[in-house]
């Protein structure tokens, strides 16, 4: 079954490349370069060091902002899920921040704090934080009260209860927030870099847009998507298997 799934996945990729090549040959235009042309630009970017440098800068911003948002979001989400009065007090604010456009937050952070790295990170964190809080809060509300009562009867401290009772139940929600967070946060980072940074993938994509360099836009996009896929395959899926091994 696994080999069949891999075969189907490979087949879908080959069909996509064939369709892409066909459209590129039919249009014969710079607006849709062929896969070969994009691969050549990708290789040149790697050899020159430009692509790895800007990709690394963006990934560093992603790691820092994502880590801050997840740590704060998990902590606040657990607190709100366990305390109804605090949840009622902050609920409207969560709804407001969930619906504030990312572009508005980014612009305000740059206006208030200047075109500095900390403002860029803050803008990304503010945009991601409400999503994490809401996801973890909903997960906390579904915690099995019987298990919590049992932990209390056995004299579990707060730390032991969190690690052995609360966290295993919250794991699916944390992984959901992580995956949706990666999908959201790198898009926000690109806008942040486009508006106020002098390096990174967003900055480069803005330059390529001004030059109508579609091949470079696609090459840089493919590079970033490939890295996100590697994070999923090498980090998130192994973590999932390890955390859920007790079910097997």
Language-model features, listed with the residues they occupy:
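Short cytosolic juxtamembrane segments of multi-pass membrane proteins
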Residues: 237-248
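Hydrophobic alpha-helical transmembrane segments of polytopic membrane proteins
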Residues: 201-239
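Generic hydrophobic transmembrane alpha-helix motif, especially the helices
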Residues: 95-128, 138
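Transmembrane-helix boundary motif in ABC transporter permease subunits
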Residues: 64-94
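Short cytoplasmic-facing helical segments at TM-TM junctions of multi-pass membrane proteins
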Residues: 131, 135-177
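Periplasmic/extracellular loop-to-transmembrane helix junction in inner-membrane transport proteins
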Residues: 26-67
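N-terminal signal-anchor transmembrane alpha helix
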Residues: 4-26
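Transmembrane alpha-helices
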Residues: 122-126, 158-191, 219, 224
């Amino acid at each position: 079954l696994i080999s069949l799934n891999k075969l189907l996945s490979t087949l879908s990729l080959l069909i996509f490349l064939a369709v892409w090549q066909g459209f590129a040959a039919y249009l014969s235009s710079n607006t849709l370069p062929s896969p070969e042309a994009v691969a050549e630009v990708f290789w040149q970017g790697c050899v020159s060091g430009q692509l790895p440098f800007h990709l690394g800068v963006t990934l560093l911003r992603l790691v820092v902002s994502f880590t801050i948002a997840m740590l704060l979001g998990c902590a606040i989400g657990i607190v709100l899920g366990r305390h109804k009065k605090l949840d009622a007090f902050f609920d409207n604010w969560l709804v407001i921040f969930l619906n504030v456009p990312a572009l508005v937050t980014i612009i305000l952070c740059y206006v208030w704090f200047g075109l500095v790295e900390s403002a860029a990170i803050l803008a990304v964190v503010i945009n991601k934080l409400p999503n994490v809080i809401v996801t973890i809060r909903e997960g906390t509300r579904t915690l099995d009260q019987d298990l919590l009562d049992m932990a209390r009867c056995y004299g579990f401290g707060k730390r032991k209860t969190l690690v052995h009772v609360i966290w295993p139940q919250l794991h699916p929600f944390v992984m959901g927030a992580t995956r949706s967070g990666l999908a959201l946060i790198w898009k926000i980072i690109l806008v942040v870099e486009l508006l106020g940074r002098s390096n990174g993938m967003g900055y480069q994509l803005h330059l390529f847009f001004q030059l109508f360099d579609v091949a470079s836009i696609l090459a840089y996009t493919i590079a970033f998507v490939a890295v996100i896929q590697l994070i999923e395959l090498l980090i998130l899926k192994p973590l999932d298997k390890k955390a859920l091994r007790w079910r097997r």
